[in-house]
C-alpha cells in the first residue's frame, strides 16, 4: 500500500471519527446533564442549560430526536426592529402630550364657561377631543407594546447566543452574522414519582464577527425543558 493510499485512509478515518463524535451531540450533552443532576452539581448544570430544570429521575432514555434545523442568525434584524420601534415611540410622545394638552384646555374652558350654552358648546368640544386623545393614547400604548416585545426578544436572543458561545459579554454580538442550529429531543424518565416525558430544546450558534473576521463556534446548549406528561 503506497503512501498516497495511506494518507487517504488516514483522512477518511479522521473524518469518520469527527462524524461519530458530532453525530449525536444531544446524547453526550444529556448524559453530562443527568450526571450533574445526580450529584446536585448546580454549577455544571448552569453551564449546560439556560434554565436548569431539576428532574427527579433514576433512569432516562431518548425516545426521539428531531431533524436538525439550520436558520440564519437574525439578531441584527431584531436589533434594528427594536431601534425602529424605539424611534417611533419617542416621536409619538410629543403627539400624545399635545393631544392631552388640547383636551385639558377645552375641559378648562368648560369649567370657566358662564352660560349654559357656552358650557354645552365647550363640553361637546371636550368630548370630541377626548375621543381623539383616547385614539392617540391607544396608538401610543400599541407602540409601547411593540417596543417592549421587540426589546425583550432581542435581549433573549442575545442571551442565548452568548450562552452558546460561552464567551461572556460580546458588545458587538448584535452585528454578528452566522447560523443557528436547532434540535428537539424527546426523553422518558423513571423515578420515585413514576414515568415522565419531556421535550428538550437544544440550540447551537456558529457566528462570525464581520468587523474582525473572527469566527465563534458555539456549543450545543439546553434552551429549555417542556414537560409532556
PLM region descriptions:
Residues 1-8:
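Bacterial N-terminal signal peptides that target proteins for export
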Residues 9-17:
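Bacterial N-terminal signal peptides
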Residues 15, 21-22, 229:
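N-terminal intrinsically disordered, low-complexity tails enriched in polar/charged
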Residues 20-39, 47, 54-55, 66-73, ...:
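Short, low-complexity N-terminal intrinsically disordered segments enriched in polar/charged residues
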Residues 59-62:
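Intrinsically disordered, low-complexity regions enriched in acidic/Ser/Thr/Pro/Gln residues
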Residues 87-229:
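Exposed beta-sheet edge and beta->alpha loop/turn motif
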